[in-house]
Amino acid sequence: MNEHQDLQKSFLETVSFDSNGLVPAIVQDHESGKVLMMAWMNRESLEMTLKNRKACYWSRSRKKLWLKGESSGNMQDVHEILIDCDGDTLLLKVSQKGGACHVGYHSCFYRKAKSDLSLEICDTLMFNPEDVYGKKN
């Protein structure tokens, strides 16, 4: 086993997956520091991400691996993966191509609460979801 494989093994053994075999992953733009999204990873998706340096997650609703940008083309190139002190949350620093959010915004955190408790759009719309995913029935 070479040193790189040994480091990967050590990292994977450090991750504390929950009872469903998942760990939350916060995704951040590696240049600006802007938080783009939160997704879930299982061991297989994390291994794929480490190997290919393309963000791959676990879709809880579809119950399958989800290569980010597979349908939309809005891929995430992974620069770094950090792990928190408890080993139960990951931070992926990525280069985002297009929008990270499936509703078309650069970040999934595109709304903020105003003092009157109403919502305000605070991000850039990058694409029309109907153009990418088709119309919902």
Swiss-Prot record:
GO terms for molecular function: magnesium ion binding; phosphoribosyl-AMP cyclohydrolase activity; zinc ion binding. Zn(2+) binds at C85, C101, C108. Its main location: cytoplasm. It is an enzyme of class 3 (hydrolase). Pathway: Amino-acid biosynthesis; L-histidine biosynthesis; L-histidine from 5-phospho-alpha-D-ribose 1-diphosphate: step 3/9. GO terms for biological process: L-histidine biosynthetic process. Binds 1 Mg(2+) ion per subunit. It comes from the Bacteria. It is found in: Cytoplasm. Gene3D superfamilies: Phosphoribosyl-AMP cyclohydrolase (3.10.20.810). Its EC number is 3.5.4.19. Its cofactor is Mg(2+); Zn(2+). It catalyses: 1-(5-phospho-beta-D-ribosyl)-5'-AMP + H2O = 1-(5-phospho-beta-D-ribosyl)-5-[(5-phospho-beta-D-ribosylamino)methylideneamino]imidazole-4-carboxamide. Belongs to the PRA-CH family. Homodimer. Catalyzes the hydrolysis of the adenine ring of phosphoribosyl-AMP. This is Phosphoribosyl-AMP cyclohydrolase.
